[in-house]
Amino acid sequence: MNRKIDYKINENDTGKTVEGFLKEHGYTHQVLVRLKQTDHGILRNGVWAYTNERLCKDDLITVQIVENECSDNIAPVNLPLDIAYEDDDIIVINKPFDMPAHPSAGNHDNTLANALMYYYGSQNKPFVYRCINRLDRDTTGLTIVAKHTLAGGILGNAVAKRAIHRTYYAVCSGCTPTCMRISAPIARKDASTIERCVDFKRGEYAVTDFIRIRYNPDNNLSLVKLRLLTGRTHQIRVHMKYIGFPLIGDFLYNPDYTYISRQALHSGRLVFTHPVTGQKMNLISDIPSDMKSLF
């Protein structure tokens, strides 16, 4: 996907090199190399610029990201998309349950990647699929997809620095504590390719905070709001099971389908800095009816 970005140089940036300025704005070495190989990739006041040139006040730096390739081996499939937000750099999807984020064995034409390949293909726009905060197949809610390499790199770095703040909602079995921090390392379970467990010897550092929003004594279920301080695979599901309040409907960790047919987990809020504009993004998705109806 193609993107043109303009930067007006102010007094604070005077004297910096073009490369130094762009690196401060999140351009990696890989992106800069690609721009150097692109016609009109980096312009200074409308003229081809070398990255070692020094900037002057009121210079106009224009970057042209050109991506004509598409993701390999992802078939475009016309699937419903609930778009929570979209601009030239990112798209945020409110993902339904029973939709994997990525193709895998047995899931070649029913994923979010397939849906987005069709969505952009129908607009004659080349598209490389870059999912930033991947959700499990049956987890609903907000997930960010970058539309070009610059946005993907900046947001990927934000994930590594824990600068994307994620709020989840879950329905758990039992009456949870009013609030709690769970700090317990997570590792892959022996003899399993997908299941995780708390393991204080082999596990990776993992921290989850939660507060209980509601409790229904009629069905002995709690609605909790959770904040991830780390991003381990199945972190919420494993942590809540570990403290004795597993998510209902979870086929791996608590296959109790009395009240719901899928794991009761929803990505309800994302707060992050926009990768290009620097704007603070605060996106919210309502708790779905299959969870809300239990309270």
Residue ranges and their predicted role:
Residues 1-36, 81, 200-207, 212-223, ...:
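Pseudouridine synthases involved in rRNA/tRNA modification
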Residues 1-181, 185, 290-294:
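RNA pseudouridine synthases
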Residues 42, 65-66, 190-194, 207, ...:
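Short Pro/Gly-enriched beta-strand edge/turn motifs at strand-loop
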Residues 50-54, 225, 262:
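Short, surface-exposed secondary-structure edge patches
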Residues 99-102, 194, 221-222:
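Short small-residue beta-strand/loop micro-motif enriched in glycine and branched aliphatics
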Residues 128-132, 196-198, 254-256:
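Glycine-anchored helix-breaking recognition loops at helix->coil/strand junctions
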Residues 147-149, 174-177, 191, 215-217, ...:
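Short loop segments at secondary-structure junctions
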